[in-house]
Amino acid sequence: MLTDNSQIRIIYVLLDGVGDLPHPDIENKTPLQAAKTPNMDKLAKNGKMGEVISVGKGIAPESDIAVFNMLGYKFHHTDYAGRGVIEAIGTGLDFKDGDLALRGNFSTLDEKNVIIDRRAGRHIEREDAKAVSKEIEQKLKFSNPLASVVVVPTIGHRVIVRIRDEHPLSPNITNTDPAYSRVDGMGVAKAVGDFLKIERCLPLEDTDVAKLSADLVNEFTEKSLKILKESVINKKRKSQGKKLLNSILLRDAGNKYPKVETINEKYSMNFSCIVDMPVEIGISNVLEMRAYSAGGLTDYEEKATVAAKSMETENAI
């Protein structure tokens, strides 16, 4: 049932990462500059121009916190659940307050444990990702027998890791992924060079629970490296000349389900969304938006059709 704002209709398109950088293969233009975009050009000419600072000046936020901000949700570091939790929710993973959820990348290390590909080739066969995840789950045993881990591959190189212990765990720990730091509880990309290695997870506060959480993450990293080194799947990939899935870079820890005002309550309108990625599904679940799927990642015509159709019953998509 539509609200008092029933006449309002909004199709809200977020072009995540569209800015990009100039590239020599396209005459040092950005992909957006090089592309033929007559419809976007017309919208721009007839629209209003401005700058939106979604998180903070000079901060390149990850998609989760950026989307929340663009939808009007401003988190302080004590409030935000962490992207690991958002993606865990988006995958339907069994997660409860006190669990530690982290997002990660399958990555490739050389024989000196230097990261040579942060995404292990990026396009990873679903079967391989599922198989190595299952190997880790079956073979990894923490020193505390009451601790356990679940590893869920999502899309391409992406993976979710959930660690559960007899005690509630803390998100106040550093990333093992050297390309991302934590600023006020949010993941922020760092300017990094080559020859990076997996970083040791450290507690961000002097508490037993933060130290325990960091220790469990480090134990996961150390033991999963050994399992992946002997992995049947990696031996097969090596024989096929493919990038090895021989490490997981972890970041954005969280330990609680986010509690926020639903988006329909916030704006007194009916909201829906078109989602593809686990982080988008997680955001829609947290904000209680009706979610539509519309083809694959690049099926834009189908997405436009679904968006137009949704305007019959929704205020915004």
Question: Which ranges hold each PLM region?
Answer:
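Generic, well-ordered alpha-helical scaffold segments in large soluble proteins
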Residues: 46, 223, 227-231, 282, ...
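Active-site nucleophile/metal-coordination loop of metallo-enzymes that catalyze phosphate/sulfate
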Residues: 2-7, 19-148, 156, 160-162
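Beta-strand elements within well-structured catalytic alpha/beta cores of enzymes
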Residues: 8-21, 42-43, 237, 245-249, ...
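Generic recognition of stable, solvent-exposed alpha-helical segments in well-folded globular domains
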Residues: 13, 35-38, 131, 215, ...
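Anion-binding catalytic surfaces of enzymes that hydrolyze or transfer phosphate/sulfate esters
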Residues: 247-317
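Hydrophobic alpha-helical scaffolding
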Residues: 8, 122, 210, 214, ...
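Glycine-rich, mobile lid/loop segments that gate access to catalytic sites or pores
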Residues: 120-247, 252-255
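Short secondary-structure junctions
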Residues: 49-52, 142-152, 271-272, 288-295
